[in-house]
Amino acid sequence: MALVPYEETTEFGLQKFHKPLKTFSFANHTIQIRQDWRHLGVAAVVWDAAIVLSTYLEMGAVELRGRSAVELGAGTGLVGIVAALLALKSSMKPLLVHCLLFFSGAHVTITDRKVALEFLKSNVQANLPPHIQPKTVVKELTWGQNLGSFSPGEFDLILGADIIYLEETFTDLLQTLEHLCSNHSVILLACRIRYERDNNFLAMLERQFTVRKVHYDPEKDVHIYEAQKRNQKEDL
């Protein structure tokens, strides 16, 4: 689940989370994301980090050829949906080098805890064309639990938006990242640095991965960090 605190106490902040529908434009598609703050809380609203990470992917900052991606703590599923749409768009233009490329055989897996899955599935099904839905899987994943349902090193790209907040989840999240990553995998984490514990997680991450900040959105105060296993080459 997208584990972030609700900090916006102004009336304006409340209004944006209580809107039942938010509309975005990515990958030449109009995406309509349902929200349900009242019943599902933080897992069912679109956080700024998800918007910034989706924009970063659309910028073509990551190049993938015939590889697979997974979103952790997907919540509403915006990032995973955008990744899947970019996969479709890019597969239509295989000669376009500087964009996010997913070819046949690639797939996107969008994950969250069981309590959020039905809501997540509804957003994914509503926003992905039927012919690419078979390439997109919504799957339960509670960090640190039942990792055997995923093959070790299964994914080339691991995505997370505002998933580093609760300290009690840090060890499980690191264990999950370690399991899902191979030596060539790339992790992209988008987050706000709200508290010292957020920096503590990054320090923990650096013990197992090479970490660097690759993007900052000053308007939304969101950082994007890229991480790769330390025993791999610097370049993907």
UniProtKB/Swiss-Prot annotation:
Catalytic activity: L-lysyl-[protein] + 3 S-adenosyl-L-methionine = N(6),N(6),N(6)-trimethyl-L-lysyl-[protein] + 3 S-adenosyl-L-homocysteine + 3 H(+)
GO biological process: protein methylation
Gene3D superfamilies xrefs: Vaccinia Virus protein VP39 (3.40.50.150)
Task of the protein: Protein-lysine methyltransferase that selectively trimethylates residues in heat shock protein 70 (HSP70) family members. Contributes to the in vivo trimethylation of Lys residues in HSPA1 and HSPA8. In vitro methylates 'Lys-561' in HSPA1, 'Lys-564' in HSPA2, 'Lys-585' in HSPA5, 'Lys-563' in HSPA6 and 'Lys-561' in HSPA8.
Lineage of origin: Eukaryota, Metazoa, Chordata, Craniata, Vertebrata
Keywords noted in UniProt: Cytoplasm, Methyltransferase, S-adenosyl-L-methionine, Transferase
EC number: 2.1.1.-
Single GO molecular function: ATPase binding
One Pfam match: Methyltransf_16
Compartments where found: Cytoplasm
PANTHER family associated with the record: HEPATOCELLULAR CARCINOMA-ASSOCIATED ANTIGEN, PROTEIN N-LYSINE METHYLTRANSFERASE METTL21A
Subunit structure: Interacts with heat shock 70 family members; at least some of these proteins are methylation substrates.
GO CC list: cytosol; protein-containing complex
Binding site for S-adenosyl-L-methionine: W47, G73, A74, G75, D112, W143, A161
Protein family per UniProt: Belongs to the methyltransferase superfamily. METTL21 family.
Protein's name in the database: Protein N-lysine methyltransferase METTL21A
The organism of origin for this protein: Pongo abelii
InterPro entries found in the cross-reference section: Methyltransf_16, SAM-dependent_MTases_sf
